[in-house]
Regions:
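Conserved N-terminal phosphate-binding loop of PLP-dependent enzymes in the Aspartate aminotransferase
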Residues: 1-185
Length: 185
């Protein structure tokens, strides 16, 4: 089994690997994007030891690593461990889910949401899938960068940085709500 943890690994779901809560033991895990710690280019393929056929230095090449990315990854992983980011993400995830339940869902009975950790989506498909992109544009006008995902790009994606401060998270959620209200009206 190969797990794609490119977007949802590195603490995004509240555990370092997204599959931990399911008790899965993958053969391979693919990581990139946030593994470098601050956006430097980096990708890693983790392989179960009994499947790894390469000896040290056997699998290499001219473009085998970006040293700055390695330093960033080390610092990012150390920060994650030292600051118990799994607990931080889980606490702030509750802030997000509580906000969605109390402030967003009451705006329209056809809205729904789903997510875990620091990756959530508000589904506009039951109303009109084009509304999600309109919210993205309105949010941008209001100073918040968001994106869409899902079928017909009808899901508004919520993916704050793991290190976001509580007050900034609340500010972003309120800007998102204001943008949704503007689009729905």
């Amino acid at each position: 089994m190969i797990v794609d943890d490119i977007q949802v690994g590195n603490g995004r779901t509240g555990t370092f690997f997204s599959f931990e809560r399911a008790g899965i033991k993958p053969d391979m895990v693919v990581l990139s994007k946030s593994i470098s710690g601050f956006g430097m280019p980096m990708a890693i393929l983790l392989i179960r030891p009994d499947l790894d056929i390469f000896r040290p230095a056997e699998h290499n090449g001219t473009f085998r690593g970006n040293q700055l990315s390695f330093v960033g990854a080390t610092a990012g992983i150390n920060y994650y461990v030292e600051h118990s980011m799994d607990k931080v993400v889980q606490r702030k995830a509750k802030m997000i889910s509580d906000f969605l339940e109390s402030e967003i869902i009451p705006l329209n009975k056809n809205l729904s949401y789903r997510g875990i950790g620091f990756i959530w989506g508000i589904d506009f498909n039951a109303i009109d899938s084009t509304l999600a992109l309109k919210v993205v544009h309105k949010a941008f006008d209001n100073g918040l960068i968001m994106e869409v995902a899902g079928r017909k790009d009808g899901v508004l994606k919520i993916m704050p940085p793991l290190t976001i401060q509580d007050d900034i998270l609340n500010e972003g959620l309120n800007v998102m709500k204001e943008s949704i209200v503007d689009v729905l009206n």
